[in-house]
């Protein structure tokens, strides 16, 4: 099986079309009735395909209902090559707009390094705190760096 390049300048048009088809298929799967995020595998693959080749940091939120089914997803903030300013108030506002019971947070590190910075850890703690005030759970915060993904939940940081 051919390895896909995740560097934007190295992707062939064929690779881009293949990724777009995979994203559409995963999107359809994630929006099927009854599909719950009991396993993070599909979420990770979806995020990897969406975010691995981005040249600037993006902060995304996946909004889930009480059964952990996807309600909606969106990019809330876009930053520079090594930083994104995230406003907790906006995250809460959008989660309430979608009537979410839980949110999965995600952002990318264009450098490919997935280890969270102290700023990442502080932001995550702050978001968990403010979302708890309105009874919204945060099952995970994922950092995408190329083909690698770091999970705050798996590392005991949530």
UniProtKB/Swiss-Prot annotation:
Transmembrane region(s): none
Keywords: Hydrolase, Metal-binding, Metalloprotease, Protease, Zinc
Amino-acid positions noted as binding Zn(2+) in the UniProt annotation, renumbered to this chain: 107, 109, 120
UniProt key word Isomerase: no
Residues in MPN domain copies: 36-158
CDD domains the record matches: MPN_DUF2466
GO biological process per UniProt: DNA damage response; proteolysis
Motif (JAMM motif): 107-120
InterPro entries in UniProt: MPN, RadC_JAB, UPF0758, UPF0758_CS
Top-level taxon of origin: Bacteria
Pfam families: RadC
Gene Ontology molecular functions: metal ion binding; metallopeptidase activity
Gene3D superfamilies for this protein: Cytidine Deaminase, domain 2
Family of this protein: Belongs to the UPF0758 family.
Name recorded for this polypeptide: UPF0758 protein YkfG
């Amino acid at each position: 099986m051919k390895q896909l390049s995740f560097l934007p300048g190295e992707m062939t048009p064929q690779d881009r079309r293949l990724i777009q088809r995979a994203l559409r298929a995963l999107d359809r799967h994630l929006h099927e009735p009854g599909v719950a995020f009991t396993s993070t595998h599909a979420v990770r693959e979806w995020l990897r395909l969406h975010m691995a080749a981005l040249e600037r940091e993006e902060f995304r939120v996946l909004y889930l209902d009480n059964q952990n089914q996807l309600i909606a997803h969106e990019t809330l903030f876009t930053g520079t090559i090594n930083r994104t300013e995230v406003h907790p108030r906006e995250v809460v506002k959008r989660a309430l707009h979608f009537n979410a019971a839980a949110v999965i947070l995600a952002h990318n590190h264009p450098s490919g390094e997935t280890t969270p910075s102290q700023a990442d850890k502080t932001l995550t703690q702050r978001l968990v705190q403010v979302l708890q005030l309105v009874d919204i759970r945060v099952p995970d915060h994922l950092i995408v760096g190329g083909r690698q993904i770091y999970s705050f939940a798996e590392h005991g940081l949530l």
